């Protein structure tokens, strides 16, 4: 089964064939580290971490690069407002970013380059563009000469005349064409700066990704990914810079994830309806948030609400409960019989369907449907009069494997027998004291942990469901 990716560049699904056999070069645009990330910022790391995990599962060696923009206008503004320097703020929010995305199940990239640590190669990249006639200096700023790059607009699928009509020259900009964009910005008084052939300044936003992608992955990469909002102008400008310099295709597959809405409204800071990751993971299990995000295809918009989160949690808990039931029955089952072969064959079909979903442009929504199918099938199997350790182990392994591909964990702390007995005794005392609310709560809590109570004339009995 081959993998097909929807390529924003061609607007169609294409068979994925990497440049080098069994190797994938992947670049994902990272955050500007001036504040905590909100859930919209967190969708790309979760989505493309899952893409990476699936490619690794399929046997590819994935070189995954995701950058940090640790100097730009937003950081300078934050530094001025807080009375701190730019590096201090950047360091703080790099650390906060790692805490948030690690909680959400994301692995570290192969490399997390920072702009400030790669200034030499960025300046060199700009100088080469100037030498080739694709860039020009204007009073300490350096701009990319867009009209010289023939393919400008091919990612956003817009004619250059239309793009130029919608562009404008801002006050203080010294460019020749409204579509030209800054590669280097002359430093204003009091701003952080680096020395360059054009004077003191710092790089523009777009050039840094082109330079760092080239440094760590080469002239041509397999997959370039990011949020839908980056397609234009950021990724369009990356293509122009990189291909003007090298004369080679910059990225062969372009992937973009959809937006997030909050309670059916577009999330935006102006509306004040954005949710910070470090806040929401205090209220909800980070694994639930990831499961929720992956329950919708990555290219589609997703509506985020607490009601939908709770509904999704019910489904996730059903899968975890099935897994817990399987683990509990592992040691008390019989040997494999001919009848068990049918169950193993069905299990293989679910595995195949999961991979077919992921091969189809990483359709995690359909892949998660197969997780539900495995869990439901497992519950049916456990109702059989005779169950085999071999089959149960196969269910357990499959659930663990598929969850790992999605960056999820199945671990569920199981109550010890002594803990169950202690809770039952507490419930008995509550009933003696006519505290029926507490009694019912203990019963319901145990039921949620798959412990079934039965009140009899001889006392309370319990069993694992």
Curated annotation (Swiss-Prot):
Quaternary structure (record): Monomer.
Pfam families in the record: DALR_2, tRNA-synt_1e
Catalysis: reaction(s): tRNA(Cys) + L-cysteine + ATP = L-cysteinyl-tRNA(Cys) + AMP + diphosphate
Residue(s) carrying Phosphoserine: 270
Stored PANTHER family: CYSTEINE--TRNA LIGASE, CYTOPLASMIC (PTHR10890:SF3), CYSTEINYL-TRNA SYNTHETASE (PTHR10890)
Keyword terms, alphabetized: Aminoacyl-tRNA synthetase, ATP-binding, Cytoplasm, Ligase, Metal-binding, Nucleotide-binding, Phosphoprotein, Protein biosynthesis, Zinc
One GO BP: cysteinyl-tRNA aminoacylation
Binding site for Zn(2+): 29, 209, 234, 238
Protein's cellular compartments: Cytoplasm
Species annotation: Bacillus cereus (strain AH187)
Protein name, entry field: Cysteine--tRNA ligase
Motif 'KMSKS' region: chain residues: 266-270
GO CC annotations, alphabetized: cytosol
Binding of ATP, residues: 269
CDD domains for the chain: CysRS_core (cd00672)
Cofactor(s) for this UniProt protein: Zn(2+)
UniProt cross-references to NCBIfam families, sorted A to Z: cysS (TIGR00435)
EC number, as in UniProt: 6.1.1.16
Keyword Nucleotide-binding among record annotations: yes
Domain of life: Bacteria
Details of cofactor binding: Binds 1 zinc ion per subunit.
GO molecular function term, any single one: zinc ion binding
Keyword Phosphoprotein: yes
Family membership: Belongs to the class-I aminoacyl-tRNA synthetase family.
Motif 'HIGH' region: chain residues: 31-41
């Amino acid at each position: 089964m081959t993998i097909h990716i929807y390529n924003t560049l061609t607007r169609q699904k294409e068979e994925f064939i990497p440049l080098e056999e069994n190797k994938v070069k992947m670049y994902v645009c990272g955050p500007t580290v001036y504040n905590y990330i909100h859930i919209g910022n967190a969708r790309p790391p979760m989505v493309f971490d899952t893409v990476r995990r699936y490619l690794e599962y399929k046997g590819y060696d994935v070189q995954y690069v995701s950058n940090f923009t640790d100097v730009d206008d937003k950081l300078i503004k934050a530094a001025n407002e807080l009375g701190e320097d730019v590096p201090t703020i950047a360091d703080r929010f790099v650390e906060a970013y790692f805490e948030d995305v690690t909680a959400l199940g994301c692995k570290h990239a192969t490399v997390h380059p920072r702009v400030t640590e790669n200034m030499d190669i960025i300046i060199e990249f700009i100088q080469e563009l100037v030498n080739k006639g694709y860039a020009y200096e204007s009073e300490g700023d350096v701009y990319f000469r867009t009209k010289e790059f023939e393919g400008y607009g091919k990612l956003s699928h817009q004619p250059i005349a239309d793009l130029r009509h919608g562009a404008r020259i801002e006050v203080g900009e010294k460019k020749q064409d409204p579509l030209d964009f800054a590669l280097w910005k002359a430093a204003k008084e009091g701003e952080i700066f680096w020395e360059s052939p054009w004077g003191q300044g710092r790089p523009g936003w777009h050039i840094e990704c082109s330079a760092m992608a080239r440094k760590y992955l080469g002239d041509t990469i397999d997959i370039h990914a990011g949020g839908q909002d980056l397609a234009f102008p950021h990724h369009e400008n990356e293509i122009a810079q990189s291909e003007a310099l090298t004369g080679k295709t910059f990225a062969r597959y372009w992937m973009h994830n959809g937006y997030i809405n909050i309670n059916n409204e577009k999330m935006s800071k102006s509306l004040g309806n954005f949710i910070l990751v470090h806040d929401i993971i205090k209220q909800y299990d980070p694994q639930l948030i990831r499961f929720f995000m992956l329950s919708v295809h990555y290219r589609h918009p997703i509506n985020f609400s607490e009601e939908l989160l709770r509904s999704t949690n019910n489904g996730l808990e059903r899968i975890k409960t099935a897994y817990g039931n399987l683990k509990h029955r592992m040691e008390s089952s019989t040997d494999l019989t001919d009848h068990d072969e049918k169950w193993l064959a069905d299990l293989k079909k679910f595995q195949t369907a999961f991979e077919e979903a992921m091969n189809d442009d990483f359709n995690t929504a359909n892949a998660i449907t197969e997780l539900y199918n495995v869990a439901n099938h497992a519950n049916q199997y456990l109702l059989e009069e005779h169950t085999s350790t071999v089959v149960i182990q196969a269910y357990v392994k499959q659930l663990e494997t598929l969850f790992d591909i999605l960056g999820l964990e199945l671990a569920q702390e199981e109550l010890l027998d002594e803990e169950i007995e202690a809770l039952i005794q507490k419930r008995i005392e509550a009933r003696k004291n006519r505290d029926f609310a507490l009694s019912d709560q203990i019963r319901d809590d145990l039921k949620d942990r798959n412990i079934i109570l039965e009140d009899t004339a001889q006392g309370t009995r319990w069993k694992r469901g």
